[in-house]
């Protein structure tokens, strides 16, 4: 597995070629204003990364708000370009990561807790509360941390069912079951 970080820049900040007037607006992200409405019915991530907020180019930082309705999960995933620092602002969350020796480090977070997920390691968050939502804010040590969702990576990319069945020591019928739920909707 290759792990990389953002390169250092030689200027205070990087202005995209299509931006001619640099003022406070360039350094302001307004995409999280929508969070002030109702709560979503499915797990939702609102990101402020390089794609959404070009001022982050070269700054080695990004941000995400994670909204967990009752009983929802952010499935096992990795961020190959950054570590993650998660701050819980509402509810409770089960969180954890698995290191390169296959050891699970997990914790039940309460409001105000901060948890660190090391760069490139598989991790998850789960709101096991059946009544109340949870909200967390994550920061990343990269303007473009990228996310690799393991369920999608394994079951929607065309990896041969025989390879998956042998890898999971199961049969092809068992491998096909999660593919149905993960298939893109028309």
Regions found by a protein language model. Give the residues of each.
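Double-stranded beta-helix
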Residues: 11-12, 103, 107, 116, ...
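Glycine- and acidic-residue-biased ligand/ion/polar-headgroup-sensing regions
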Residues: 69-73, 79-101, 111
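A short, N-terminal "cap"/entry segment at the start of jelly-roll beta-barrel domains
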Residues: 1-64, 168, 174-186
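Structural recognition of the beta-strand scaffold that forms the well-ordered cores
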Residues: 64-67, 85-88, 94-96, 115-117, ...
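Beta-strand elements of modular eukaryotic interaction domains
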Residues: 52-55, 75-77, 113-114, 126-127
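Extracellular/periplasmic catalytic domains that process cell-envelope and extracellular macromolecules
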Residues: 58, 78-80, 86-88, 116, ...
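Short acidic-glycine-tyrosine-enriched beta hairpin
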Residues: 56-58, 99-120
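Conserved beta-strand elements of beta-rich interaction domains across eukaryotes
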Residues: 1, 70-73, 92-93, 114, ...
């Amino acid at each position: 597995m290759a792990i990389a970080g953002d390169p250092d820049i030689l200027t205070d900040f990087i202005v995209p070629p299509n931006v001619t007037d640099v003022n406070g607006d360039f350094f302001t992200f307004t995409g999280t204003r929508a969070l002030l409405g109702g709560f979503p019915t499915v797990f939702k991530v609102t990101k402020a990364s390089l794609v959404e907020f070009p001022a982050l180019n070269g700054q080695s930082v990004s941000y995400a708000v994670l909204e967990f309705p009752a009983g929802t999960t952010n499935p096992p995933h990795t961020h190959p370009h950054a570590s993650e620092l998660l701050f819980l602002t509402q509810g409770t969350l089960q969180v954890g990561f698995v290191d390169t020796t296959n050891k699970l480090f997990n914790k039940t977070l309460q409001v105000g807790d901060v948890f660190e997920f090391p760069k490139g390691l598989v991790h998850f968050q789960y709101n096991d509360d059946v009544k109340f939502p949870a909200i967390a804010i994550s920061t990343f040590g990269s303007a473009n941390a990228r996310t690799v969702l393991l369920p999608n990576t394994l079951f929607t990319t065309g990896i041969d069912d025989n390879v998956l069945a042998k890898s999971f020591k199961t049969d092809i019928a068992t491998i096909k079951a999660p593919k149905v739920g993960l298939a893109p909707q028309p």
